[in-house]
């Protein structure tokens, strides 16, 4: 009887290890958001723009930092945005001046949605 229990337990543990090992190791935080790259603009043909995701995270503000804030906040966030590293000013057929991005990278976010 004891041998049957240990064999059954071994089979269950082996099955759990196989399931855990087959689980994908990919990072789930960026699912649905592509890497920061150049893509064609949907409105202006032949104009490239930087789109995609970079790094962002939020965490509870440490007490020491919170005590030095003028307006204490419970959550602190860090982020980098997909921005143009280089670009050139061009004019569209309709006379609109736009920036055609030539290279992208992740850098400090200057504009945040409120």
Swiss-Prot record:
Compartments reported by the entry: Secreted
Primary subcellular site in the record, as a coarse category: secreted
GO (cellular component) term, any one: follicle-stimulating hormone complex
A Pfam family annotated for this UniProt entry: Hormone_6
Family classification: Belongs to the glycoprotein hormones subunit alpha family.
Signal sequence range: 1-22
Entry keyword annotation includes Oxidoreductase: no
Cysteine disulfide partners in this protein: 33-53, 36-82, 50-104, 54-106, 81-109
Annotated source species: Oncorhynchus tshawytscha
UniProt-listed GO biological process terms: positive regulation of steroid biosynthetic process; thyroid hormone generation
PANTHER family, per the entry: GLYCOPROTEIN HORMONE ALPHA CHAIN (PTHR11509), GLYCOPROTEIN HORMONES ALPHA CHAIN (PTHR11509:SF0)
GO molecular function terms noted in the UniProt entry: follicle-stimulating hormone activity
UniProt keyword list: Disulfide bond, Glycoprotein, Hormone, Secreted, Signal
InterPro entries: Cystine-knot_cytokine (IPR029034), Glyco_hormone (IPR000476)
This protein's name: Glycoprotein hormones alpha chain 2
Glycan attachment sites: 74, 100
């Amino acid at each position: 009887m004891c041998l049957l229990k240990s064999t059954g337990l071994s089979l269950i543990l082996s099955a759990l290890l196989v399931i855990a090992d087959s689980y994908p190791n990919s990072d789930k935080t960026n699912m649905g958001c592509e890497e920061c790259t150049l893509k064609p603009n949907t409105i202006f043909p032949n104009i490239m723009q930087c789109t995609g995701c970079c790094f962002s995270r939020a965490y509870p503000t440490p007490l020491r930092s919170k005590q030095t804030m003028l307006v204490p906040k419970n959550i602190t966030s860090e982020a980098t945005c997909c921005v143009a590293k280089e670009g050139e000013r061009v004019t569209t057929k309709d006379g609109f001046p736009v920036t055609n991005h030539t290279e992208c990278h992740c850098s400090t976010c200057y504009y945040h949605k409120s």
